[in-house]
UniProtKB/Swiss-Prot annotation:
Pfam family membership, one: LRR_6
Family according to the record: Belongs to the LRRC42 family.
The keyword Repeat is assigned to this record: yes
Compositional bias segments (type: Basic and acidic residues): 362-378
Region of interest (Disordered), residue spans: 360-399
Originating organism: Xenopus tropicalis
Top-level taxonomic group: Eukaryota
UniProt gene name: lrrc42
Name of this protein: Leucine-rich repeat-containing protein 42
Amino acid sequence: MFQCLEPERNEETGPVYVRERGKLSVVGSHVSELRTRPCRLFSKGFSVELCGKQEDTSRHRQKPFIFTYTKEGSLRYSAKSLFTLTLDLITDNIHYVDSLMGFPDQIAEKLFTAAEAKHKFFTPCNGVMALRKFTEAYGDLVLSSLCLRGRYLLISERLEEIKSFQCLRSLDLSCCKLGDEHELLEHLSSDPMSSLTELYLKDNCFSDTGIRKMTASLRVLGKGLDALKVLDLSSNPGITDRGVLFLFGFKLLQFLDLSDTSIQDRSRTVKKIETKIGLVLSKKPIIQFEHRNCRTQGWAEQLLDQWENYIFSAIKPKDTLKSRKAAQQFYGKETKQNPLDSGICTLLTPVEQKQTHLQFFRPEEQKDSDSSKSDKRQRSTKRTGADPGQEDCTIAPATKRPRVTLTAADWDLLNSY
């Protein structure tokens, strides 16, 4: 039997085993009986691991207790409060929250600070969604004033996050080199930016086309930057006499800066601005355009600094900068200051060009009369307006978002758990 099967054996397939009368033997071998080891079900390095729910092991798991010291200096173990544990749970799952409307401002501020500490606003998709939930519910409490002067890297990297801020009253985009085709210029005329009262657009390479785009919704639909009071368009050589005509829609404007532009007929432009808007040419520099009081204010003030530090740490090699600075100090060379570090605004206008002072202001006598006229005009347009949805857009954010505040007794009750 073994001799018949011998020619059919292939070396590539390996030995062929035959069981006969309860004994195992190899086909073609002279050994009738072969001692074999028991066959393994799995390989030698195989292992089985029983695991439950997979958790993120990269982050440190917070324990539900804290250690404090007594007056005597001994270590005391105490559990976290229920409010703190609940706050941590909501912070870890902030992207699953549907809305924050109706939550008290004090709790929302603590929740925003906790989410900021855990870098919940850094991810591209979930970070923008979480930030919009805060801005939609609390508006100017998240950010009321935003200063992006010379921070064009932050604008390019965090554009969607910046566009999510609503109910801003002051916005400084000076020295950011945006241009007429930038996406942020179109966003300025949208409904979330209708609460702006101060807008600084100095040195942004704007022309008459950019001014036309920015004021299109105000001139055609009567919506957009209708509450604007301070406008800075200086150091934009592309703005000419034709671009000034698009500014006549700002009826509440009190301060206007058109210095260092390409306006040819100065006297005619001054007369048009005085008759259409009621602004008078100022002989002295106006304090509002010195950018002294413009700064970022709100809950997200430190968040913007974290974004900017993260961007700079990614583009700047720290070791080479330190070694270069040490070598320059050793050889006595003067170090050149980087505009990114100092925040200096470098203008595009050449130094040889003669600077023209062209700043306008509204006299004190006309401020009260113009404001009353504008209020009456807005009320009449609301009554004769077509859509009730447009009326809702013009309502103040404070009336649209009723806020709940906690008293001292409420805080004592929360801390007692």
